[in-house]
Amino acid sequence: MRAVPTWIDKVHDRDKVEQCIYDLAFRPDGSQLIVAAGNRVLVYDTADGTLIQPLKGHKDTVYCVAYAKDGKRFASGSADKSIIIWTSKLEGILKYTHNDSIQCVSYNPVTHQLASCSSGDFGLWSPEQKSVSKHKVSSKITCCGWTNDGQYLALGMMNGVVSIRNKNGEEKVKIERPGGSSSPVWSIAWNPSKDEHNDILAVADWGQKLSFYQLSGKQIGKDRSLTFDPCCVSFFSKGEYMVLCGSDRQAALYTRDGVRLGSIAEQNAWVWTCRVKPDSNYVVVGCQDGTIAFFQLIFSTVHGLYKDRYAYRDSMTDVIVQHLITEQKVRIKCRELVKKIAIYRSRLAIQLPEKILIYELLSDDSADMHYRVKEKICRRFECNLLVVCSQHIILCQEKRLQCLSFTALRQREWLMESLIRYIKVIGGPAGREGLLVGLKNGAILKIFVDNPFPITLLKQNTSVRCLDMSSNRSRLAVVDEHNTCLVYDIHTRELLFQEPNANSVAWNTQCEDMLCFSGGGFLNIKACSFPVHQQKLQGFVVGYNGSRIFCLHVYSMAAVEVPQSAPMYQYLERRMFQQAYNIACLGVTDSDWRDLATEALEGLDFHTAKKAFIRIRDLRYLELISSIEERKKRGETDNQLFLADVFAYQGKFHEAAKLYRRSGQDGRALSMYTDLRMFDYAKDFLGSADPKDTKLLMKKQADWAKNSREPRAAAEMYLSAGEHLKAIQIIGEHGWVDMLIDVGRRLDKAERAALSRCAVFLQQLQQHGYAAELYSKMGDLRALLQLHVHATHWDEAFSLVEKHPQFRDDVYVPYAQWLAEHDRFEEAQRAFHKAGRQAEAVRVLEQLTHNAVVESRFSDASYYYWMLSMQCLDIAREDSEQKQEMLKKFHSFQHLAELYHVYHSVHRYMSEPFSSNMPEILFNISRFLFHNLSTHTPMGISKVDTLYALAKQSKLLGAYKVSRHAFEKLQSLKIPARYQDSVELSSLTVRSKPYRDNEDLIPMCYRCSTNNPLLNNQGNSCINCRQPFIFSASSYEVLPLVEFYLDQGISDEEAVSLIDLEVPRVEKNKSWQEMSSGESQCLKLEDGPDDPEDDPFTAKLSFEQGGSVFVPVRVSRAVLRSMSRRDVLIKRWPAPLSWQYYRSLLPDVSITMCPSCFQMFHSEDYELLVLQHSCCPFCRRPIDESC
């Protein structure tokens, strides 16, 4: 850092008496300087120090001045207790007074409110206010300052206190300095930096201390001792530095943390005030003797560079190491003035005022940025240049070079014949590095650290400014004092060439033949002996690595990517392909790589071309080069043919065709033009080419017609060329049905692929008849079936299956799926069954059944369970392994079907407002259901609904005992809230009824004639003989039927034949009986009861009953012969079930049995239900369907 005086002035009054300069203030734009001198306010032009105008208005000494941030006005305060507000046009506009002399003034940077401070109070004035608000203080105010946001005002006082107040003058923070009144606070300043998170206040007191505080009053760090009484502290505009002045008669530069960096100006009297010009490096000081001195601070660049690592000084006390490739930075805080920096490999040397620090990298990683202290040399050195090596530091002092170890031992010294102008480490083994030294007299020497004797490389007539040696140390570049770049051959000391306008030079570390130099705002790149390539660039070139040029501009180092295109093209012009490739490797664009590869390929330098195409990943050309290399290995040597291939790849087709013809390869030319659809040019080569190529040409021309959106022409060309599949594809895609039919009929049936493709397109175009015609022509029955299935032409499919049963699965399975998709699930189940897909059929039925139960469609659930049972019976008949399991499921599903059939009526009674069933029927149904729910309740069936219906109908019909029992059962169940009151009320009222049942309702066993209770422990069987009751499937009354079984050895067919014999019985004489009433007479033919001995079946009933175990009725052949066919009902179950036989004991009661589900009905009920539903109410068999 150097301070250069710009101008100096000394202020006197009329009597030549020196006027003390108490305060200074800059206009915000820096163009004017306001000076408090004596009782006048002086305005200077900062450019040259001329006095613009003295301002008069005060009657006593002016102590303070301040300029508003907006530049519109400034203020001055005087010992005459007054404040004057001046405009920027130097006109006084306002004056107000305090009770004491004015000590300091300060403008708010945001609101432009003026704070004026005196010995006993301070005032706040703003342009918007007419009056000044004043606030008393306990001590004399010596200095003041606003925070950057204008929210708080700091006051420094004579008693050593710093008071921080808000805009209204209220004290918020009070800072008491340790010295108290013996250390008056003489100057304060807020750091204006925008990078700080907190407002930082610098406080200088006459206890010779400098301190820093946060806005909260918390001190930052410790007090810094000064050797003088500070009179003024002033920050630079960005807050990175500050200036202190005082009783030591000088102004000094400090860091923002209070570290002294150096002296700016030494004067002959106390320096009372100092200010920094806004946004610049100019400092002005005002002295006791009236001197006003204006200085420019010049901060020199302290830096070092080694390859891609650049170290430079920042904020005078820090060192930043920057990796120019990765852009990583690391800051090393030294907390002292950094004087010199040197960097080499992993070493970093930093010279401080009293010591040299040697740092090293933590690891050998090229990207590592972690440094640690290796050695400290605690000695003061004076030197012009500093160089560091692996184990030494080199100090340059004028003509002398000293080599010191890291322990400060002087190991070697060299004395030069002239001043040393440039020094550079050029590498070498650790401890034996070489140095390149340039002298003022033009001598250039090489010095080795371990050798006391310098080696003179050459000597020129002009002074050396910059040096660099090429990577293999064969050439030397020198920039002399006339800005000329000279390049020498080190071995012969011959001057190779020279270039003007150079201020620095650097060889490319990766290419021996390239160097760059800068000067005159241009960057110059020179390759070999070619002309220089220029481009604009500001700064000094300090390094050249590959395509990166390291350039120092003012204080910043930048790595500039410079494409090496120009030198590469210079080599290409001379067909030096390998050298051009080496240059391109340093960094060129993709288009440059392509140009290099193309030029090398045309020059038949396949090796270089291949490497260049690899760089840009051009696989097409790499394949070409690979094929050429393979052909050369096989012995091909015709370079014209190779070049023709290259031209063809490059799009130079006519040149390629000419070369093909010269080489006798007309076929290749024909193929090339054909692929390019240049059929007119291709025809020129047809005569001399292979005749087979004519057909190929037609195919290619058809392809071209297709791609050029002329499909009809393309199809016709394909047909002409025999490419039927391609022609059919085009015709089909465009939906030309007539052409498809015509092609299909013309094709031979042996061309199955073309016919099949044609049929597929006809099918897609909904022309099923023509498609069927083609499939029939091919004899493809499976495809024909699939066509019918796809078109849902089921009748044609079924008729075809009848002729070819092996395709049954191909039809019935899709048919079943189609039915299921159209919600025709029952038909789908039957179709699955026909297709032999029992598992799918059962799965469909199970899903239908589950859905019906969940949706409370219990009639449907009953029907589906019946169908499931019949499905299981079919499986049991067909699969002997699953016979027992399927028979078990059959009986279970039959039982469930009957339960859901019954519960359907109960559910309708409970959920609908009216019921179509008679009370007796509902009573029978609910009683039947109750007897079957004693052990297990199927899903969906409500026991509550069953018992409630039974209780209600029992009560209605007079079966009070049953009703009471049902209501008691209901009490143990969870009853829905809507029935709760009704159940409780009915349960009470039924207790008022007699505890008996209506005798008309009591069922009788037709085998043993025993009256059974309505609630039977045996369920739906007789309590005496255990004979199961047979119920009507509509009214659920007990039918007068008794099941009987055949004796051993009697088959079903024999039994039926015996029953059909109907042996006539001996008729007894019948008599007439007269019956008369009051108004009529009638005769009745008396038909007396048969004698049991006359009916063998009745005898079986009488003599084989009794016991606790049910004993079925078994009949012999004689008994079968005695039976009437009208009295016997037979359930003719399919195998593997046996038939069931029932004898009606009341022949006059007409009973009808459904031939499909074998359910028994009263004939009248059955006929009525069939009329209503046109089918059986249980199995839904239509009345016109034969079983």
Curated annotation (Swiss-Prot):
GO biological process: camera-type eye morphogenesis; cilium assembly; heart development; intraciliary retrograde transport; intraciliary transport; melanosome transport; mesonephros development; negative regulation of smoothened signaling pathway
InterPro entries: Beta-prop_IFT122_1st, Beta-prop_IFT122_2nd, Ift122/121, WD40/YVTN_repeat-like_dom_sf, WD40_repeat_dom_sf, WD40_rpt, Zn_ribbon_IFT122
Predominant location category: other
Keywords annotated in UniProt: Cell projection, Cilium, Cilium biogenesis/degradation, Cytoplasm, Cytoskeleton, Developmental protein, Repeat, WD repeat
Keyword Repeat applies: yes
GO cellular component terms, A-Z: ciliary basal body; cilium; cytoplasm; intraciliary transport particle A; non-motile cilium
Cellular localisation: Cell projection, Cilium; Cytoplasm, Cytoskeleton, Cilium basal body
Domain of life: Eukaryota
SUPFAM superfamilies, sorted: WD40 repeat-like
Keyword Endoplasmic reticulum: no
WD repeats, residue ranges: 16-54, 57-97, 99-135, 137-175, 180-223, 225-264, 266-306, 459-498
Changes seen on gene knockout: Reduced number of cilia in embryonal pronephric duct and shortened primary cilia in Kupffer's vesicle. Embryos show shortened body axis and curvature, cardiac edema, small eyes, pronephric cysts and a distended cranium; shh signaling is reduced.
Subunit structure: Component of the IFT complex A (IFT-A) complex.
Biological role stated in the UniProt entry: Required for cilia formation during embryonal development. Acts as a negative regulator of Shh signaling.
PANTHER family the record matches: INTRAFLAGELLAR TRANSPORT PROTEIN 122 HOMOLOG, WD REPEAT DOMAIN-RELATED
Protein name as annotated: Intraflagellar transport protein 122 homolog
Organism: Danio rerio
